Amino acid sequence: MLTGKSIYHVNQNLGKAFEPGQLNGYFNDMTQKVLMGDKNLDEKGIPFLEHSDGSHVQMPTMIFQYGLGAYDLWVIRKEIDYFNKAKRCADWAIDHQEDNGAWSVFFYIYPNAPYSAMPQGEAVSLLVRIYKETKDEKYLSAAEKAIKFMLTDVRDGGVCKCNDFELILLEYTHLPLVMNGWIFALFGLYDYFLLTGEYEEEFKESVNSLEKALVHFDCGYWSMYDEEGKIASPFYHNLHIAQMKALYMVTKKKIFNEYAERFERYQKNRLNELRAFAKKAMQKLTD
């Protein structure tokens, strides 16, 4: 899928109710996942992915993003049905969280590397919002377990690379570094800090590490999906722009705004877009 467009890849611009420094709307707009995705819900209202053979699988990332989109719709529209949708997703997160605090995301394709920092962060963002509204400690407890696992080094079975100089949050523990997954994980860390005041230094350390790594995600005319040269689809390029804007609003680091503006310039240049499309097509053929 060269254009990166599907019900699972709806545009995720800057969140419609996002406010930096406030545990309110989410950083990215996930609302279309709710508004367009109600046909793929089970009897409990939880999203599922349908395979070509008709079988269903429930993916943590899909569920957490659906919950965040529903929460945003509740913030915007004040319709309790949307809050209930978000809460059901948070309850699913608790019911399916493993003892180590993780959710197995890649169990079906990478059984030896099933964990990811990205859904850990997204789950935390959902759980702390539901905790804020309900004051039910089970949501905060699950979020704390998720953060602790997310900050466990990959050498110890976790999903980050950490040492005295950097803190990198890994979407894949066995594949090249992916930027969007790192940032989604960062968003969860920031949300947990907003609620509890904890892990501020870890957030700052990872932001600084990301700042140094940004050069690896810019090929000069388009953004890169990963640090080893896989070019971003239009969907991921647009997502990178929104994430850069959100990070700038949160951190006030000018470099994130500079990259947001740079990526937007790339996006508006038709020649750049065609060049990126051609390279993406070639990479798809050789994958």
Where are these regions (language model features)?
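Long, well-ordered core segments of solenoidal/helical folds
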Residues: 2, 19-53, 83-102, 140-162, ...
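Extreme N-terminal leader/anchor segments
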Residues: 1-21
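Long, hydrophobic/aromatic-enriched structural stretches that serve as scaffold segments
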Residues: 57-118
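Structural helix-adjacent loops and short alpha-helical linkers that scaffold large soluble proteins
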Residues: 73-87, 130-145, 190-204, 247-261
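Hydrophobic, well-structured mid-protein blocks that either form specific transmembrane helices
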Residues: 130-180
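Carbohydrate-binding/catalytic loop surfaces
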Residues: 19, 29-55, 101-122, 160-181, ...
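Hydrophobic alpha-helical segments and helix pairs
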Residues: 94, 99-149
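Well-ordered alpha-helical segments within folded domains of soluble proteins
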Residues: 59-74, 115-132, 176-193, 233-249
